[in-house]
Amino acid sequence: MSNTIAYFDITIANEPAGRLTFELFDDVVPKTANNFKHLCIGDKTNEAGVKLAYAGSSFHRCIKGFMLQGGDFTRGDGTGGESIYGEKFEDENFELKHDKPMLLSMANAGPGTNGSQFFITTVPTPHLDGKHVVFGRVIYNRSLVRRIENIPTTSDRPDQEVTISSAGVLSPDEFAQLEAERQAKQAGSDGGDIWEDWPQDEEGVDAEKPEEALVVAGKLKEVGTKEFKAGNFAVALDKYQKALRYLDVHPVLPNDSPAELVESFRSLRLPLLTNAALCALKLPASPNTSSLVVSLTSRALTLPNLSASEKGKALYRRAQAYVLKKDDEAAEKDLKGALECVPGDAGVIKLLKDVEAKRKARREKERQAFAKMFG
C-alpha cells in the first residue's frame, strides 16, 4: 500500500484496549495526511519548542451514532490543539465525502481552521461534506471504535477515559507482516477470528451476499466451539453472537433463494442460538445472562422445521433461564413441553421434579401464612 499507515494504541480507563490502524489518503490530501502522520510520530515542535504529538491525549467527545473526536493535546476539551504548520491551516480540498462510517476527518471551528483535532465517523455524515476534510479511514480493529462509541458519556465526554497511549506509523515491511498475519488467520492456520465485530464495518467480506455471510458465520462457530471446549465460555458466547450478527444481515432470505441455502442458514442459526444460550448458562448467574438465554432460546423456537429434539433442547435451556429468574411457573410450562418432545430425558425430568417441588413448597408456605392470618 503506497499510502501512509498510522496507528493509535488505545487505553480505556487505563487498561490496554487495542490498536486502531489507519490508512491516510496521501494521494488525495497530502498536506492534511502529513499533519496527522507527524502528530502520530511526534517528531515536530512548535515555535516555542513544545512537542506536537497525539500520544497521551484523549478522545474528549463521543456521540453515539455520529462520531468520536480527539486530537486536542494542549487542552483536552476541544478548544485546543495545534498543527505542524502553525496553529491552524487551510482546508486542502473537499474531494472525499463523508459517505460511510470509519472515516478520519478534520475537526474545525469554521473554514481554514484545521489544527490537530480530528474525528472518526461511526455512520455516514453527508451534512459535513464541503465543511470538513476527509483524510483517512480506519482499516483494522473497527470493533474498538464501536466499543468506544458505546461507552456512556456525560456532556458527550466518555465516562471512562479513552487515551491514545502511543501512536506512530508502520513501515511497509511492518504493514506487510501485519497483512501476512491476517491472511494466515483467514486461512485457518491458527483458528483465529479476523473479522470485525459488526458486519457493516467489515470490508473484507460482502455480508450483503448471503453466501459470504454464511461462510464467515460458519468459521466463527468453529472458533466459538473451540473456545467452549477449552472452557472459555464468555469468549465462546462472544463468537457465537458475532456469528449470529453476520447471519442476521439476512433475517429472511429472498423468495428465489436456493432451498439448500435456506436450509444452510437455518441449520447454522439454530445451533448458534442454542450454543450461545448454553454458554450464557455457564457464566455466573445474573439478570442479564438469564434474560439473554430467554431471548436466544425464544428466537430458536421461532425457526421453521424444528425437530422434536431441537425444540426440546431449546425449551429445556429456556426453562433453566426461567429458574434463574425465579419464574418457576414459566419454567414448569417449558419443561413439560420439552418432555413431550424428548420423553424420558433425564435432565428434563430432574429439573421438572425440582421445579414442581419448589412450587409445592411455596404453595404450602403461603397456605400456612394465610392460616395464621385468618386462623
From Swiss-Prot:
TPR repeat residues: 217-250, 270-307, 312-345
Record bears the keyword Repeat: yes
SUPFAM superfamilies from the UniProt entry: Cyclophilin-like (SSF50891), TPR-like (SSF48452)
Keyword check for Mitochondrion: no
Catalytic activity: [protein]-peptidylproline (omega=180) = [protein]-peptidylproline (omega=0)
One example of a Gene Ontology biological process annotation: protein folding
GO cellular component, one term: intracellular membrane-bounded organelle
Pfam families for this protein: Pro_isomerase
Keywords, sorted A to Z: Cytoplasm, Isomerase, Repeat, Rotamase, TPR repeat
Residue stretches spanning the membrane: none
Molecular function terms, GO-annotated: cyclosporin A binding; peptidyl-prolyl cis-trans isomerase activity
Enzyme Commission numbers on file: 5.2.1.8
CDD domains membership: cyclophilin_ABH_like
Main location: cytoplasm
Family: Belongs to the cyclophilin-type PPIase family. PPIase D subfamily.
Function: PPIases accelerate the folding of proteins. It catalyzes the cis-trans isomerization of proline imidic peptide bonds in oligopeptides.
The protein's name in its UniProt record: Peptidyl-prolyl cis-trans isomerase D
Natural source organism: Cryptococcus neoformans var. neoformans serotype D (strain B-3501A) (Filobasidiella neoformans)
Gene: CPR6
